[in-house]
From Swiss-Prot:
Domain of life: Eukaryota
Spans annotated as Disordered: 1-40
Family: Belongs to the BCP1 family.
GO terms of molecular function: protein kinase regulator activity
Pfam families in UniProt: BCCIP
Protein name in UniProt: Protein BCCIP homolog
Coiled-coil features, chain-numbered ranges: none
Taxonomic source organism: Drosophila melanogaster
GO CC, any one term: nucleus
Length: 297
C-alpha cells in the first residue's frame, strides 16, 4: 500500500468519548468536561489506510507510548524504523471529505492529518542492534522474569536468542472505540506485504510473532467473577489462539489511552498488558478467525 494510493477501509460509527485531537497534557485532566460524552452518541467517520510517511512520526510515536507507557523504550526511534520500511504496514487516517484532487492536496492531507492507528511488524532479530529494538527485547525479558513462569521465561529467551527463526514484533495499535472490523483489511494488507517482501528475499520470514496487547481488568467483587475488557476486541481472540502468553498489571502507570470522561457509575478498571506468542505461519488463519469473530460466527 503505497503512500499515494489510499485504501478506504470503511465507515465507522465511533463513540466520541475520546478527544482524538487532544494533547498528552489533556490526558491527565481528571475533571469531567461540561461537553463530556454522555453515552448513546455516535459519529460516522470514514477511515483509510496508507503507507506511513515522515509526517506520521509523532502520531506513531504517541500510539507506541500508549502501549509502553513509562518503559525505557525510544518510541521516536521505533517510529522512524516503522516509517523507514514503509513498504510494510499501514497507518489509519481520516478520509478527505472533498476527495483528493492533486498530489499537492494529498501531501497537505498527510501533513495535517491525525494518525488514528498503526499496523506493522518489526524484525526483533535482524534489527536487534537498533537502540529501540534492543530496549524492547530487554523490556520483554525483564517483564517475563518478574511475571512469567520459569518455563515461559526459558521459551521466550530461546525464541529471542534464535538466529535461524526470526521474530517479528507485531504492532496493532489504534485509538479506542475504532471498531475491530477495521483490523481485518489492515492485517490482510500486512500479510500480503510480508509475503511480497519474503519473495524478494527480504528479512520478513518470521517463525514467531510477538504481540503486546492492552486490556483492563474489573476485579472480582462480592462473589462476582472478574472481567477482562480488551482495548482492541480482536485481541481477545488472539489471546486465546496464542501459543503461550504472560500478563502483568500496569496499575502503577498512567494509561492515557483510556483516560477521559467516564460515564457515571462506571467501575474503574486496572490496566494490564499481555504478551502473546503467535506462530507466524498461522497469521492468515488468525485473520480469517478475526473476521468470523467480528461477524459473530
Amino acid at each position: 500500500m503505497s503512500a499515494n494510493k489510499q485504501k478506504k477501509l470503511s465507515t465507522m460509527e465511533v463513540d466520541p468519548n475520546e478527544d482524538v485531537s487532544s494533547s498528552s497534557e489533556d490526558d491527565d485532566d481528571d475533571e469531567p468536561h461540561p461537553d463530556a460524552y454522555k453515552g448513546n452518541e455516535e459519529v460516522q467517520i470514514d477511515f483509510e489506510g496508507r503507507a506511513p510517511v515522515d509526517p506520521d512520526a509523532q502520531g506513531i510515536s504517541q500510539l507506541l507510548q500508549r502501549l509502553f507507557l513509562r518503559a525505557h523504550i525510544n518510541c521516536n526511534q521505533m517510529a522512524d524504523l516503522i516509517i523507514a520500511q514503509n513498504f510494510i504496514g499501514s497507518v489509519i487516517c481520516q478520509c478527505d471529505d472533498e476527495g483528493t484532487e492533486s498530489e499537492t492536496e494529498d501531501d497537505n492531507m498527510v501533513e495535517d492529518g491525525t494518525i488514528f492507528g498503526i499496523t506493522s511488524v518489526l524484525n526483533l532479530t535482524a534489527k536487534k542492534d537498533q537502540p529501540s529494538i534492543a530496549q524492547l527485547r530487554t523490556y520483554i525479558l525483564d517483564r517475563a522474569k518478574t511475571h512469567a513462569s520459569p518455563e515461559v521465561q526459558q521459551q521466550l529467551k530461546e525464541i529471542l536468542d534464535s538466529e535461524q527463526r526470526h521474530v517479528g514484533f507485531l504492532i496493532n495499535e489504534r485509538f479506542i472505540n475504532i471498531p475491530a472490523q477495521i483490523s481485518v483489511p489492515l492485517l490482510q494488507s500486512l500479510q500480503q506485504e510480508i509475503e511480497a517482501a519474503k519473495a524478494k528475499k527480504m528479512k520478513y520470514d518470521f517463525g514467531t510473532l510477538l504481540l503486546l496487547v492492552k486490556f483492563y481488568r474489573k476485579e472480582s467483587k462480592k462473589g462476582k467473577p472478574g472481567e477482562d475488557v480488551y482495548t482492541n476486541a480482536e485481541d481477545e481472540l488472539l489471546s486465546d489462539r496464542a501459543k503461550f502468553s504472560f500478563e502483568y498489571s500496569m496499575a502503577s502507570e498512567t494509561d492515557s489511552g483510556m483516560s477521559g470522561d467516564w460515564l457515571e457509575g462506571d467501575a474503574v478498571m486496572t490496566p494490564y498488558r499481555k504478551l502473546l506468542v503467535l506462530e507466524a505461519k498461522k497469521l492468515p488463519q488468525l485473520i480469517d478467525d478475526i473476521q468470523r469473530f467480528i461477524n459473530g460466527e
